[in-house]
Amino acid sequence: MTTTVGIAVKEGVVLATDKRVTAGYYIAHKQGEKIWKIDDHVAATMSGGVADLQSLLSFLTLRAREYKIEYKRPIPIRALVNYVSLILFYSRPYIYLVHSIIGGVDREEGAVLYMVDWLGTVTRERYIATGSGSPYAKGALEVGYREDMSLEDAVDLAIRSVKAAIRNDPGSGEGIDVVVITKEGFRRVFTAQQKIIITE
C-alpha cells in the first residue's frame, strides 16, 4: 500500500511518492525511499512487492550501465521499459507483484513517462498514479494537470496529489519524496515548502 505519482511536461518529468512502508496494515517503516534512480536521465517509482521491485530495478540499473559503457551514451528509456515488460511477461505464471512508473528525459523522445504493471503491460502517460492511494491522487491530477504547465507547477501538482492520498488512504503517509528529471539530470526536491532543488 502506497502512493506514487508521475507527471511529464515539456521541460522534464516529476516523480513523487509517500514515505510509509506497509505490510498489510502493519507500518513497517516510516522513511521508505520509493523512487529508484536508474541513471542520471531516468528513474522509477516502487509500488508493490519491495523484493520483486528491487530485483527488477537492480537489473535495469545494471543494464543501463552496460549500455552506457558499450554505446557511449545513455540507454533510451523505451529500451528499459521494453526490458522490464519482457521480464514481467515471460515470468508467468510466477508473476512479480509490481507496479512501477518509469520516467525521464532522453534524446530520442524527450520527457517521457511509462506505467508498467505486473503482467508486463506498458502504457505511455502524461500523468499517472499507482498504489492504494492512487484513486485520490489521480483525482487531484485530473483536476490540476495542464499540457502547458511548467516544471514548477508540475512539482506543486505532484505534491498536492500525494497529499490528497495521504489524507484519505491509510496505506500512505509519513511525508513526501519528490524527484525532478530534466535534460540536465536527476534532482531531488528536498523540501516542498522551500523548493530547494539539489543535484544528486
Swiss-Prot record:
The active site is at T2 (nucleophile). The gene is psmB2. It catalyses: Cleavage of peptide bonds with very broad specificity. This is Proteasome subunit beta 2. The 20S proteasome core is composed of 14 alpha and 14 beta subunits that assemble into four stacked heptameric rings, resulting in a barrel-shaped structure. The two inner rings, each composed of seven catalytic beta subunits, are sandwiched by two outer rings, each composed of seven alpha subunits. The catalytic chamber with the active sites is on the inside of the barrel. Has a gated structure, the ends of the cylinder being occluded by the N-termini of the alpha-subunits. Is capped at one or both ends by the proteasome regulatory ATPase, PAN. GO terms for cellular component: cytoplasm; proteasome core complex, beta-subunit complex. Belongs to the peptidase T1B family. Component of the proteasome core, a large protease complex with broad specificity involved in protein degradation. It comes from the Archaea. Keywords: Autocatalytic cleavage, Cytoplasm, Hydrolase, Protease, Proteasome, Threonine protease, Zymogen.
